[in-house]
């Protein structure tokens, strides 16, 4: 195990999921805009080479199943709807793709490949191994966190446990890791953090639920990684360097007095008056 600090950001399904109720493209697959926003933060802070993004296998599987189920529902609704209306200007035809689940699974795999080609390192966080089975069962039967809450009777609690156990098993091999777990589930947050810290005192985890919280921690990481080049998100582009130079007291002096090495200034003019009217 390396002693070098590692930085990891893990996503929960409820952060990345797409809504398929009012508008949807069932030809493609992608995470929602939140994923892009967080990746943009890593790029703006220039820490994309140090911070890795982990997508649990549970998340991939769950989101794939979500689009399959949404497609099955919407295609039936659409078929029923178009039977009620006929227009001479429009003709609706069907395409036989035989098996939508297999079709979309191949689309998901291509999306994974696209992410892997990007600047940011994207890793799939494996399901917990057989060695974690006993822990998973104990949580299930005893309703220990992250089981419980309003949805304790659904399979959601079980999926939450799989993700959490995946993170714990991952940290066993990365004991110096600094981890962000981005999830909309706020229940048992303190309990889970306490469990994590007792198991891995050299590692750290922040369980966060909002983009502004992610931004704050990523900025802290960026400052820790390189204090001298650290630039908070949003400040880098606040000031236009050209505008700053034009508005500085030295602008006129530098513009007039600059010697381009062509003709001595003294041979051209004895006195110069310069007034800046406007600039774009």
Language model segments and positions:
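Active-site-proximal, substrate-binding regions of enzyme catalytic domains
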Residues: 2-177, 187-280
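Short aromatic-hydrophobic micro-motifs that form the base-stacking/packing surface
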Residues: 180
């Amino acid at each position: 195990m390396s002693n070098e600090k590692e930085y990891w950001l893990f996503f929960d399904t409820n952060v990345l999921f797409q809504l398929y109720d009012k508008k949807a493209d069932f030809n493609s697959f992608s995470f929602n805009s939140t994923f892009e926003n967080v990746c943009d933060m890593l790029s703006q802070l220039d820490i994309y080479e140090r911070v890795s993004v982990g997508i649990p296998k549970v998340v991939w599987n769950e989101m794939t199943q979500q689009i399959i189920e949404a497609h099955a529902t919407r295609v039936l609704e659409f078929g029923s709807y178009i039977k009620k209306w006929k227009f001479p200007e429009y003709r609706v035809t069907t395409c036989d793709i035989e098996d939508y689940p297999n079709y979309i699974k191949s689309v998901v795999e291509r999306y994974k490949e696209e992410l892997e080609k990007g600047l940011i390192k994207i890793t799939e966080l494996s399901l917990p191994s057989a060695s974690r089975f006993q822990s998973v069962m104990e949580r299930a039967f005893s309703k220990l966190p992250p089981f419980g809450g309003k949805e304790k009777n659904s399979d959601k609690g079980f999926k939450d446990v799989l993700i959490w156990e995946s993170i714990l098993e991952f940290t066993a091999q990365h004991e110096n890791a600094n981890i962000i777990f981005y999830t909309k589930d706020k229940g048992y947050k303190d309990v889970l953090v306490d469990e994590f810290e007792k198991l891995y005192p050299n590692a750290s985890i922040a369980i966060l639920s909002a983009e502004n919280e992610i931004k704050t921690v990523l900025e802290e990481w960026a400052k820790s990684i390189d204090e001298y080049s650290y630039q908070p998100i949003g400040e880098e582009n606040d000031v236009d360097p050209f505008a700053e130079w034009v508005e500085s007291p030295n602008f006129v002096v530098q513009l007039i007095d600059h010697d381009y090495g062509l003709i001595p200034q003294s041979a051209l003019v004895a006195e110069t008056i310069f007034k800046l009217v406007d600039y774009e």
